[in-house]
């Protein structure tokens, strides 16, 4: 997945009309409000005129996922958590359409929130992305609040740093304790997959961890923008699978299957048959399917 090529001057920001970015108050007042979606309808929003030449959109070979031209009324609050330096803010910047440059004027110190409306499986959804996990000092209490306010979570680690992978496992346990009675969508994200020679955590380890902790798994590269689009599409699907009616999810699944190749359908069918009679194969099948973000 790549963003459309856009010529940008140093210190400029490319933004879609349906994405917004604002700075969060340092005292965390925004976290004390109720979580109803309508609370976002009165926020100040950045606007973009047709003359803006620094627009960006996610490139896709299909019509499954494009930036919506109209605001949807479905909001998903997604929280990025993980160790420092694993690429959370870079993922957030790509999501927001911000040109990632250390000299960019759009760099904001402190807690950030991004909003973007996507079209996923023919339906619009607005993601409110919170990237404030690394704020420490007097705001350490924000960690506890982050564990409570999300509709979904992206636990990010670097495949080049085993310590960050182990920390991700700890965060999954903490999140389970904080939200014991809730079925919260969680995706374990192995970032920096482009750094093959520096890899310390294998794909199989990431999958096994996701199976053990009952979450989804994907590897991304924020540097080359690989699988970032799929990541945010996937978290929308995971929330929908838990929240919406069975009939509505079945229609979405049918929508996806129409675009699925015959060989993949065959592998899925035979895999289910074999797994019924073999527990070890069932575990392997679950391990392989944990990266399928379109199913529970």
From Swiss-Prot:
Chain residues that bind GTP: 82-89, 191-194
PROSITE patterns from the UniProt entry: RAS (PS51421)
Record PTM: Phosphorylated on tyrosine residues.
Region (Calmodulin-binding): 266-285
Pfam families: Ras (PF00071)
Family: Belongs to the small GTPase superfamily. RGK family.
Protein name: GTP-binding protein GEM
Organism for this UniProt entry: Homo sapiens (Human)
Lineage summary: Eukaryota, Metazoa, Chordata, Craniata, Vertebrata
Gene name, Swiss-Prot/TrEMBL: GEM
């Amino acid at each position: 997945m790549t963003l459309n090529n856009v010529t940008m001057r140093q210190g400029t920001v490319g933004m879609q009309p349906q994405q917004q970015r604002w700075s969060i108050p340092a005292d965390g007042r925004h976290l004390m409000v109720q979580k109803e979606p309508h609370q976002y309808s009165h926020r100040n929003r950045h606007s973009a005129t047709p003359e803006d030449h620094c627009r960006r959109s996610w490139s896709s070979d299909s019509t499954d996922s494009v930036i919506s031209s109209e605001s949807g009324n479905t909001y998903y609050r997604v929280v990025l958590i993980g160790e420092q330096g694993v690429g959370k803010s870079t993922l957030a910047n790509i999501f927001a359409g911000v040109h990632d440059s250390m000299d960019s004027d759009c760099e904001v110190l402190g807690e950030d929130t991004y909003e973007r409306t996507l079209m996923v499986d023919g339906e619009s959804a607005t993601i409110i992305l919170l990237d404030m996990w690394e704020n420490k000092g007097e705001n350490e209490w924000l960690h506890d609040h982050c564990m409570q306010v999300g509709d979904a979570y992206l636990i990010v680690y670097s495949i080049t740093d085993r310590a960050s992978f182990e920390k991700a496992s700890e965060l999954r346990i903490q999140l389970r304790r904080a939200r014991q009675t809730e079925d919260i969508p969680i995706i374990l994200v192995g970032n920096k997959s482009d750094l093959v020679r520096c890899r310390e955590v294998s794909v199989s380890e990431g999958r096994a961890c996701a199976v053990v902790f009952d979450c989804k798994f994907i590897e991304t590269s924020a540097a080359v923008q690989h699988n970032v689009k799929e990541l945010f599409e996937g978290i929308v699907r995971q929330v929908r699978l838990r929240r919406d009616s069975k009939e509505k999810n079945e229609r979405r699944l049918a929508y996806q299957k129409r675009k699925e190749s015959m060989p993949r359908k065959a592998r899925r069918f035979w895999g289910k048959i074999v797994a019924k009679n073999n527990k070890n194969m069932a575990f392997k099948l679950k391990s392989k399917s944990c990266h399928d973000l379109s199913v529970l």
